[in-house]
Amino acid sequence: MTTPPLELATRLAATVESQHYTLYERGDECSIGLDAVMQVVIEPDGTVRRSDATLGPASSPCAGVAQALAGIPFEGWRAYGRADFELAHLLHGLGGSQGSRPLLTLSIPRAEIRLRPGQALLRALDSTDLDDLQARVVAQDAASEPAAGQPVQIGVDTHAGEEHLYKQHVAAALAEMHAHAYQKVILSRTVEAPADLDMVASYLAGRRCNTPARSFLLRDGDFQAYGFSPETVVEIDALGRVSTQPLAGTSALCGDSAENERLRRELLADPKEIAEHAVSVKLALQEMASICSPDSLGVSEFMEVSCRGSVQHLASRVSGRLASGRDAWSAFETLFPAVTASGIPKREALDSIRRHEPAPRGLYSGCVLLVDSDGAMDAALVLRAVYRHGERCWLQAGAGLVPSSTPEREWTETCEKLASVACHLRRRPLPDAAD
C-alpha cells in the first residue's frame, strides 16, 4: 500500500455500493466495517435484541449487551457501533426515546478492512467477498484524482439560527444553577447545511485540517454522519486498563502563532474555563472510582491544552484498571454520556437538556465505538460532526454552562465550534453544461 490510510479509506468509502458502513480512525489505523451479518441493539424501551438469537433477562441494558456479545459465534470479531445521546435517559432513569430508532446499535460486519501505513488487513466471512475487497483496495490504492475534479467549498453561516431563543434558554439554565439545581450543563443548537453536501469529500477536507482524538464516517441507509471527535468517552484495552478523557474549557485558535499563545495563556488563567474543567475532572474521578481498583486510579494528564481544529481545550485524562467483576460494559454504563457533553450531576443535567433544547439530540454527543472480542472498547464522543438524514443536513454544537457563564459568551462558543467544521464543507462541482 502506497496511499496513506486515511485517504485510501475515504476512497473506499466513496466507491463501495454498501448502504451500511462505518469508518473509524484511531491513531495510525483506519478500519471500515461493511454491512452487518449480525446486530445487537438497545431499543427505546430498553429491550436488548440480537438479530439471530433470543436473549435471557439481564440486570440492565448494558449487561444485556454484554450477554448478547458473549454468545457471538465468530472468533476474533470486531463490532462497529453507535449510541444516541438519548440512551443516557434510559441509563439514568429518565425513560428512553419516543422514536423507533434503536438507542444503541452494534454490527458485526460482513466484511472488514483495516488500514495502517503500508499495509491492509482484509477480513470477510465469505471468500468471494474477500476477493472483491482485495480487488477494491488494490484498485483504489493505484487510483489517481477523480476526473470530475476537486470538490467545491460551500459556506454555512454559523451565526444563523434563533440567537435570542438560544440565549433565553441559557439564561433560564443559569437561573436554575444559581438556585443550586445542578452545577453544569451543556446546551446545544443546530445550523442547517446545504443538501448537496458531499459527506465523504467534506470529511476528508475537514480531517486534513483537524487534529482529533478520533474521527469517523458512517452510513446507515438514509442516515449519514462524520465527525472529528475531540475526546473519547472511554478507552479500554484487553487487560482491563480503562481511561476517559474529559475536555472542558474552550478558546478559539487563529492563523497567528503569537495570538494563539496569548489565547492559550488566557484559557489557562480564565476562572470560568478552569471551573468548568475542574468539576468535569472531579466527576470523571468519582465515576471511575466506582468501576476501578482503588490503587489503580489516577489523573495521568491534567489541564493540558489540546488543539482541535480551530479551537483549543483544557484536557485531562483519568485512568485506572477495571475492578474484579467489572467489564467494558460496566465502564460504558458508568461513563456514558460524557460529562463534557451533558453536565453535573448527570441526571439533573439530562433533564435540563431535555427541557431547554427543542428536539432530541440523536447521535450528537452520543458516541461511535469499536468493541473487540477480547474485551477492548474504544468509544469516540460525537462532537464537531455533520449529519444527514434524507435530504436534511445539519451541524450541531454546544457550550458548557457553569454559574459564572453568560449567554453572550456561550453563544460565541457555539459559533467557534461550528466554524471548526463548517469551513471545510464541500460539494462536488456541477457537471459542465457542454457535456
Predicted regions located by residue number:
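An anion-binding catalytic pocket shared by soluble metabolic enzymes
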Residues: 26, 30-42, 102, 107-111, ...
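A short glycine-rich, hydrophobically flanked beta-strand micro-motif that places a catalytic Asp/Glu
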Residues: 81-83, 215-218, 286, 361-369
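Short amphipathic
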Residues: 1-5, 190, 301
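Cytosolic ligand/metal-binding cores
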Residues: 48-53, 115-140, 235-309, 386-435
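Conserved hydrophobic core element of enzyme catalytic domains
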Residues: 314-435
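Non-catalytic accessory segments adjacent to catalytic cores
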Residues: 57-193, 419-434
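An N-terminal JmjN-like helical accessory module and its immediate linker preceding a catalytic domain
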Residues: 1-53
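A residue-level signal for conserved active-site and pocket-lining positions in enzyme catalytic cores
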Residues: 81, 113, 180, 234, ...
